[in-house]
Amino acid sequence: GKQWDVDFRSFIATAEGVVESTDASVHPLAQYWYNGTGTYLDIPLTTDGCSWNTPNFDGSGVSWTDSGSDSTNHYVTSSYDTTYAPVGGGAWYHSGSDGTLYAVTQSFDTRSSKDLKINAKTVVSLWYSSSLGVNSSASLPNYGFITKWESGVEFNTNTQIQPVMQFYSVDTNTIYPPQLEFKWRDYSSVLTGSAT
């Protein structure tokens, strides 16, 4: 078979406050969400689409999925800490019933590139199998990815430890929308002659 791999790439629009080594993790989302129509620096601010509190739109009455196992035994977790907010923060697949972890982490520091480039082969393989109806016990619906800070940063109230990174969206009018970058080896090595 041919060898292949895939990376999830997301390109930085603005970055502030990354003053120490910090990890961000990327997870497959566990439920459908509405993209919204807002753009950076809208005046007035556009607030339709998903938010910290809901995957739909404010006032929809729909909440992010609570932590626990779903119908295919994938473990779902969510980002909120009741100390800071009563609910919200997204819901993502953490691991499969076989113990496979879905999160991929990337480290950032003051001088590192802030673009995301993480290996997504495990998740994309599950999405592909799900779309074909292959191996239903390992199916994983494709709702996209969520990126979050490690918990020590996400829920830290110290103003010295509050990095903010904004990435270009799928609706950007630039050449930097998020993307899956596929790579494959489309040749086979053939040895000729003899080794003595």
What label would you give each PLM region?
Residues 1-196:
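Secreted, disulfide-rich extracellular signaling modules
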